[in-house]
Curated annotation (Swiss-Prot):
<dbReference type="GO" id="GO:0006782">
    <property type="term" value="P:protoporphyrinogen IX biosynthetic process"/>
</dbReference>
<keyword id="KW-0350">Heme biosynthesis</keyword>
<dbReference type="GO" id="GO:0005737">
    <property type="term" value="C:cytoplasm"/>
</dbReference>
<keyword id="KW-0560">Oxidoreductase</keyword>
<protein>
    <recommendedName>
        <fullName>Oxygen-dependent coproporphyrinogen-III oxidase</fullName>
        <ecNumber>1.3.3.3</ecNumber>
    </recommendedName>
</protein>
<keyword id="KW-0627">Porphyrin biosynthesis</keyword>
<dbReference type="GO" id="GO:0046872">
    <property type="term" value="F:metal ion binding"/>
</dbReference>
<feature type="binding site">
    <location>
        <position position="106"/>
    </location>
    <ligand>
        <name>a divalent metal cation</name>
    </ligand>
</feature>
<dbReference type="Pfam" id="PF01218">
    <property type="entry name" value="Coprogen_oxidas"/>
</dbReference>
<dbReference type="InterPro" id="IPR001260">
    <property type="entry name" value="Coprogen_oxidase_aer"/>
</dbReference>
<dbReference type="GO" id="GO:0004109">
    <property type="term" value="F:coproporphyrinogen oxidase activity"/>
</dbReference>
<keyword id="KW-0963">Cytoplasm</keyword>
<feature type="binding site">
    <location>
        <position position="102"/>
    </location>
    <ligand>
        <name>substrate</name>
    </ligand>
</feature>
<comment type="subunit">
    <text>Homodimer.</text>
</comment>
<comment type="similarity">
    <text>Belongs to the aerobic coproporphyrinogen-III oxidase family.</text>
</comment>
<keyword id="KW-0479">Metal-binding</keyword>
<dbReference type="InterPro" id="IPR036406">
    <property type="entry name" value="Coprogen_oxidase_aer_sf"/>
</dbReference>
């Protein structure tokens, strides 16, 4: 396993965490100042994995972000024999290294979309990058969806013109609730097992995916920060959040990988919304 690659990827995910948390706290401050409220701040808690490594959870519950969590983790060790065939390159000895960032934002306003993002670097006897970002509006707006996709398309096109259509398709297929026969949201991009034989290029792309999210999502949140919403709209948001829960518990690879590698359960399930209704 390449020590330098592990160090620079882990360092980037920490840096991106700091940038995202700073921007989200800034949004909370902007809203709080107009309402005479005390702005919310992220609360951080670290955890250690018994088999090796650990992570830091950053959680904020505020007036804008009902619940937003930004997790970073760097874990290593051996995958249990019963799960080794599910992770490429882990079949023989089960050794693995994984570092990454995951972010889920659930907003108080039903007019502001929920958002999920993660990027990661994994080494077994093989190595690869994966991740992506997707948007889940409860009241979709075309221009908002176009803006979100355009940010990721720009990041993709910088490296390969085939990336965006391929990764968009993979996102649409991945974030699909088969039992409901419906998509979870309006998509974005999703990629996995990315290894073009050029670590520097694949890493630079993964960094640009993070920068794309940082450029577009705060803008979307701010555009609807002060729009009024009704009790009926909030009720609909809570019901639709149920789909989020269903996907994460039934299909999400990150959830499965975290549980297979004895990750921190609180961090793994951080993506679940704070309040939800099932009808």
């Amino acid at each position: 396993m390449n020590i330098e690659n592990k160090e620079i990827t882990s360092s980037w995910f920490t840096n991106l965490r700091d940038l995202l948390c700073k921007e989200f706290e800034k949004i909370e401050e902007e809203y709080a100042q107009t309402k005479g409220l005390k702005p919310a701040k992220f609360v951080r808690s670290s955890w250690q994995r018994n088999g090796g490594g650990g992570g830091v959870m950053s959680l904020m519950k505020g007036a804008v972000f009902e619940k937003v969590g930004v997790n970073i983790s760097t874990v290593f060790g051996k995958i249990s024999p019963e799960f080794r065939n599910e992770i490429p390159g882990a079949e023989l000895d089960g050794k693995f290294f994984a570092t990454g960032i995951s972010l889920v934002a659930h907003l108080k306003s039903p007019l502001i979309p929920a958002m999920h993002f993660n990027t990661r670097y994994i080494e077994t006897s093989k190595s690869w990058f994966g991740g992506g970002g997707d948007l889940t509006p409860f009241y979709p707006e075309k221009n908002e969806t176009v803006k979100f996709h355009a940010a990721f398309k720009e990041a993709c096109d910088k490296y390969d013109s085939s990336y965006y259509p391929k990764f968009k398709k993979q996102c649409d297929e991945y974030f699909y609730l088969k039992h409901r026969k419906e998509p979870r949201g309006v998509g974005g991009i999703f990629y996995d097992y990315l290894n073009n034989g050029n670590f520097e290029q694949d890493f630079a792309f993964t960094q640009d995916v993070g920068k794309a999210l940082l450029s577009v999502y705060p803008e979307i949140v701010r555009s609807k920060l002060f729009l009024p919403w009704t009790a009926e709209q909030k009720e609909y948001q809570l019901i639709r959040r149920g789909r989020y829960v269903e996907f994460n518990l039934l299909y999400d690879r990150g959830t499965k990988f975290g549980l297979m590698t004895d990750g921190n359960v609180e961090a793994i399930l951080m993506s679940l919304p704070p309040e939800v209704k099932f009808n």
